[in-house]
């Protein structure tokens, strides 16, 4: 299981291998705390939830990194474009077996129309919501292009335009 967070200090998306961290917990009890912090950070939507501080060590000195929801960098991720090309350039053979990508996007792809109240906070909220939606679409296109380039079977599930349940509140 891979989970993404955003290191706000570095303005970088970080992908965590949660399986490896869980396995490390057998010999390193602090790995369980890191696992929990990553889970919290991955859901820490800026301004809605507090960021999560993660302890790190650089050149023998302790630091803390501020992590929030990985969606501030990428709504959906697969692997870096051109990864297979880079691996091949290093002389590593890549097995040519069939590969598939399955993406579950917990959102609609079409824009939702709404009258926007003429207030600063409402306008800002709607603008941020629009940014998030377009970033998500861009991420899907990027993953599709990567899948095509690498010969992967691309599969996408999302909430269709025919879904009409009433939205009562955020995070419901």
Spans of features found by a protein language model:
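Patatin-like phospholipase
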Residues: 1-172
């Amino acid at each position: 299981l891979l989970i993404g967070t955003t290191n706000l200090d570095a303005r970088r998306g970080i992908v965590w291998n949660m399986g490896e961290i869980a396995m490390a917990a057998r010999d390193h009890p602090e790995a369980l705390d890191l696992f929990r912090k990553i889970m919290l950070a991955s859901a820490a939507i800026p301004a809605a939830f507090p960021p999560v501080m993660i302890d790190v060590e650089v050149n023998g000195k302790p630091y803390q990194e501020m992590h929030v929801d990985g969606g501030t960098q990428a709504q959906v991720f697969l692997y870096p474009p051109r990864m297979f090309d880079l691996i091949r350039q290093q002389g590593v053979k890549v097995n040519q077996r069939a590969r598939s990508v399955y993406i579950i996007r917990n959102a609609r792809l079409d824009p939702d129309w709404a009258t926007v109240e003429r207030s600063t906070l409402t306008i800002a909220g709607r603008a941020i919501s629009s940014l998030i939606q377009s970033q998500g679409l861009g991420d899907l296109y990027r993953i599709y292009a990567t899948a095509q380039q690498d010969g992967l079977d691309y599969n996408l599930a999302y909430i269709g335009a025919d879904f009409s349940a009433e939205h009562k509140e955020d995070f419901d």
